[in-house]
Amino acid sequence: MRLTYCNLRCTYCDTEYAFYDGKDMSVQQVIDEVEKYNCKLVEITGGEPLVQLEDCLDLMKNLCDLGYEVMIETGGSLPIKDIDTRVKIIMDLKCPSSGMEKKNLYENIQYLKKNDELKFVIGNREDYEWTIQIIKKNILQGKCEILFSVVFGELEPVELVSWILEDKLDVRFQLQMHKYIWHPETKGV
């Protein structure tokens, strides 16, 4: 589910519609909507879901209590320490080309669990080198899953993969598959 609002303005953002579009709903209304679907996995994304902190925390706790597997995608600029430990966190650290690098809240790293994911969206070689330094400086290897993704249309996936292989990095390469299956600007897929 995609929540509205974001406190960041990344140069490569592909969900600007999530800044303001949306429908006001109570936590219970959201849960009622989720229950209409035959699935037990709920991934909360944005925008930045943690902009709506109290309601978002309440929603995640209630979904976990109801037996759902819950994941949250966050841009890493807002505190994650109060997120229910049953929730899988997928957190970005913003690379220099995003224009939002200074917004990274590095103290969030201490709250990541082994099954959480730390994602770097890489737009160029500078971002790649910066990411390697961040991994080393914060001793991230083995703390959680580390994901490398490309800025769509800026860096060819094969180029990033070749750097990863050349440097023998223990990271997971990730593609936004929906942009390859459907038109890159298709919403709701």
Regions from the PLM with identified roles:
Residues 3-4, 8-87:
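Conserved Radical SAM active-site core
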Residues 51-189:
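Conserved AdoMet/S-adenosylmethionine-binding subsite of the radical SAM
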